[in-house]
């Protein structure tokens, strides 16, 4: 087992559907030779407070760490809940400190969903918790921004283009969603085509049901049914393998 913590490359791209991770050349070779463990949290928390959501997230994080995951991705707006008509006030960093502490303690990178404010307007966004950094990083979904924690960088771009400028060394694209029925079918079709077209693995974390992982050929590796669980993926020299881990 070889961890990818601390060795993300400079170019990572979040487009409209999610977040793209680009390990550097040496890391890419290492990944193909050894294990890279990732997980999507199929999180369906319907709590009324951010503190309750955080406690629920910590349960998922501990389980992912138990399975030696390097990266855990939560669905859209996981820290506040996706069902509200209007986006709530973004939680302050002090309130989210337990998640950053967990990232440090377990040495795991976390992506969770929450509202962000830009120019007086609230919009859907992401929070990034990294083991090597003492600050929570926030940015809006689908807008231009960049993030460089130490030797890692995450760049957020506008995803309106039909031809996103993907780094040829990119090995994983993640998508944080909260969709059902028709929109879910649309999403999985879009993500599968994306994986095939750009030859990149895709991890989808969806709230409540239907999280999935596709390989670089667009072939489905694993897809979850309903319920709270971890959908995990491990990449080794033979490619991707997936598993479903129910939460106890």
Place the predicted regions along the sequence by residue:
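Extreme N-terminal starter segment of soluble prokaryotic enzymes
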Residues: 34-38
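Short terminal hydrophobic/aromatic SLiMs and anchors at protein ends
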Residues: 1-2, 11-12
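Cys-nucleophile CN-hydrolase/nitrilase-fold catalytic domain and related Cys-dependent amidase chemistry
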Residues: 50-132, 181-200
